[in-house]
From Swiss-Prot:
Homodimer. Keywords: Lyase, Pyridoxal phosphate. Disulfide bonds: none annotated. This is D-cysteine desulfhydrase. Pfam families: PALP (PF00291). It comes from Salmonella typhimurium (strain LT2 / SGSC1412 / ATCC 700720). Belongs to the ACC deaminase/D-cysteine desulfhydrase family. HAMAP family: D_Cys_desulfhydr.
Length: 328
């Protein structure tokens, strides 16, 4: 795989050493299958999470362009917005966050606790909107207004999910391949599939590094029919920028996100409690809980290609546990 193409893109180092890849012995015994976990929840900044991998590339590009302000968007409890704001604070940049309330709740914990509380600690400028119906256009409109105030804004898309941001998960695939070498022969990888950048970056990287490994994206906000074109579009854009081919099919399961994005469900919450009680690992109600519910049910329903070891990508999100109390 011509990874030298990745060096063409400016990159800041926020993460340092590879995140741990760990065996989960008690969960493995419980499920009757070898389960491993990639701990992107323990990245170093602001309670961790996967978006730092994307921000290493995106914020480097922002600084190259001379930006002094990062603008992004997401839900009130967005992990991506929290990590973007933290990076901005670390680098002395201004951060403007365009937020929506996707579940229409008036619950005080959701509106003020968890990730939203952390945004205030990072001195984030908050702009509320009724809904992110066209986030790219809404972010551009906001950037124009911020620029008129004398700032030099750089727009980071929802979830950091552009071809540039997703380079972080092409690199993650290399990290996984190196960590698994001569240790475990993975059969499948499971990841939450939302804004699609993490999923697409892994798809490109794993196709070239571990082509026999099955990659399953568990959707957290959309049906397969809605999500698959988003993942494929990013997959092809990433491959194009790296001068690679990307022919691997995109596998998605959409049975686990109902009743909708950001709304906890019973299977997801059971998965959160199971990982906490068996392994001391904290999942969240929005992304990783639902993705783990998919992994658990996938084993039960024999949905995986074979009975080999499974790697779960832990993308973070634990701050949302506090926002979703008393569901937790």
């Amino acid at each position: 795989m011509p990874l030298h193409h990745l060096t063409r893109f400016p990159r800041l180092e926020f993460i340092g050493a590879p995140t741990p890849l760990e065996y989960l012995p008690r969960l493995s015994d419980y499920l009757g299958r070898e389960i491993y976990i990639k701990r992107d929840d323990v990245t170093p900044i602001a309670m961790g999470g996967n978006k730092l991998r994307k921000l290493e590339f995106l914020v480097a590009d922002a600084l190259r362009e001379g930006a002094d302000t990062l603008i992004t968007a997401g839900a009130i409890q967005s992990n991506h917005v929290r990590q973007t704001a933290a990076v901005a604070a670390k680098l002395g940049l201004h951060c403007v966050a365009l937020l929506e309330n996707p579940i229409g709740t008036t619950a005080e914990n959701y509106l003020t606790n968890g990730n939203r509380l952390l945004l205030d600690l990072f001195n984030t400028q908050i702009e509320m909107c009724d809904a992110l119906t066209d986030p790219d256009a809404q972010l551009q409109t906001l950037a124009t207004r911020i620029e008129a105030q004398g700032f030099r804004p750089y727009v980071i898309p929802v979830g950091g999910s552009s071809a540039l941001g997703a380079m972080g998960y092409v690199e993650s695939a290399l990290e996984i391949a190196q960590q698994c070498e001569e240790v475990v022969g993975l059969s499948s990888v499971v990841v939450a599939s939302g804004s699609a950048g993490t999923h697409a970056g892994l798809a490109v990287g794993l196709e070239h590094l571990m082509p026999d490994v099955e990659l399953i994206g568990v959707t957290v906000s959309r049906s397969v029919a809605e999500q698959k074109p988003k993942v494929i579009a990013l997959q092809q854009a990433i491959a194009g920028q790296l001068a690679l081919t990307a022919t691997a099919d995109i596998h998605l399961w959409d049975d686990y996100f109902a009743p909708g994005y950001g709304v906890p469900n019973d299977a997801g919450m059971e998965a959160v409690k199971l990982l906490a009680s068996l392994e001391g690992v904290l999942l969240d109600p929005v992304y990783t809980g639902k993705a783990m519910a998919g992994l658990i049910d996938g084993i039960s329903q024999k949905r995986f290609n074979d009975d080999g070891p499974i790697l779960f990508i832990h993308t973070g999100g634990a701050p949302a546990l506090f926002a979703y109390h008393p569901h937790v």
